[in-house]
Amino acid sequence: MSQEIAVIGSPDFTTGFRLAGVRKFENVPDEAKDDELDEAVTRTLEDEDVGIIVMHEDDLDHLSRNARQSVERSIEPTLVTLGGSGGASGLRDQIKRAIGIDLMDE
């Protein structure tokens, strides 16, 4: 079964993905993130057609502790964050979490 990419974030963040063909998205305006982001993440986590969730790194700060733990611990769908200050180490942690080993370990 083929799974899709879903994008969660502000309309400015999701628009580029939508133009690139991503069909599943949750628009949450910046001023509503504290109230609506948890619900958007929960809906997306429960969608069996989604294999990857893309969010902006800074949006994780708007999630409740439970929602943040759920999305960070989720194997399928896998969370990929962009932006923020995580940089290469953030990507390294995401890969390690997804496959269970550190490919860059010496």
Swiss-Prot record:
Record family assignment? Belongs to the V-ATPase F subunit family.
From which domain of life does this come?
A: Archaea
Natural source organism: Haloferax volcanii (strain ATCC 29605 / DSM 3757 / JCM 8879 / NBRC 14742 / NCIMB 2012 / VKM B-1768 / DS2)
- Its gene is atpF
State the oligomer form and interacting partners: Has multiple subunits with at least A(3), B(3), C, D, E, F, H, I and proteolipid K(x).
Q: Which HAMAP family match?
A: ATP_synth_F_arch (MF_00312)
Keywords of the record: ATP synthesis, Cell membrane, Hydrogen ion transport, Ion transport, Membrane, Transport
Tell me the GO molecular function terms: ATP binding; proton-transporting ATP synthase activity, rotational mechanism; proton-transporting ATPase activity, rotational mechanism
Please state what the protein is called.
Answer: A-type ATP synthase subunit F
| GO BP field | proton motive force-driven plasma membrane ATP synthesis
> Which InterPro entries has this protein been placed in?
ATPase_V1-cplx_f_g_su (IPR008218), ATPase_V1-cplx_fsu_bac/arc (IPR022944), ATPase_V1_fsu_sf (IPR036906)
Does the entry feature the keyword Mitochondrion, yes or no?
A: no
The answer on whether this UniProt entry bears the keyword Cytoplasm reads no
